[in-house]
Amino acid sequence: MIYLKKSFNSTIKVKEMAPEERPREKMLAKGVKSLSNAELLAILLRTGNKNKNAIELANYIINRDIQGIRHLEDMTIEELCNIDGIGLSKSTQIKAALELGSRVASFKPIKYKIMNPWDIQRYYMDSLRYLKKEVFKAVLLNTKNEIISDVDVSIGTLSSSLVHPREVFKEAIRRSASKIIVMHNHPSGSVEPSREDKNITSRLIKCGEIIGIEIIDHIIIGDGLYFSFKENMII
């Protein structure tokens, strides 16, 4: 049962709160997007502990780390269980909800067509923006600019020695791709291209001209931001 503290230390049930203040009722009346992160988490928790109601407990969990709601993804079930009021049942519900959201975000529709740099960043943003290591990816396109496949070329600190043209073009040749968009993430969140980023791009473009498979863009993904070499007329 969820409780809300009164100023004189007695408690009232959340069901006795004004309807517009209750997370479930608020969601039904105004839509799920009207809820704060704490209210969404409170719906999963359902109850609080002896000192906090569900919303207060949700706020406490979110504010335990500077990353806010995002740090829940890195927490284990055991770590969640160590929080007062969070047992095995609530911990598994939280982790299941996070995984479901992650799978929805990473779902890739078949034959997704790329019309501009915004399309490609939208397609890959959620799967790359939170990674703690740099991942260099080659996205393979057909003649209609539809995604055929993608391949992780390297994982780790980006350098021309790790991003070898052979690995970029090998799968493209096998899949009969006509174009390639290369992309990688910056774990720092910044999307400013480094000198190494530019050198790698130039090298791949030259190789593509020889092979006959065009590198049409290089996208850098940051924390909700992106940088397109094509949009910025670097290529």
UniProtKB/Swiss-Prot annotation:
Task: Give the UniProt family note.
Answer: Belongs to the UPF0758 family.
Give a Pfam family name. Answer: UPF0758_N
Matching entries from CDD domains are given as:
MPN_DUF2466
Give the PROSITE patterns listed for this entry: MPN, UPF0758
Place the motif JAMM motif on the sequence: 184-197
Quote the record's binding site residues for Zn(2+). Answer: H184, H186, D197
Single GO BP term: proteolysis
Query: What is the protein name stated in its UniProt record?
Result: UPF0758 protein CD630_11440
Which organism is the protein's source? Clostridioides difficile (strain 630) (Peptoclostridium difficile)
Q: Residues in domain MPN?
A: 113-235
Q: What keywords were assigned to this record?
A: Hydrolase, Metal-binding, Metalloprotease, Protease, Zinc
The terms under GO molecular function for this entry are:
metal ion binding; metallopeptidase activity
Q: Does the keyword Glycosyltransferase apply?
A: no
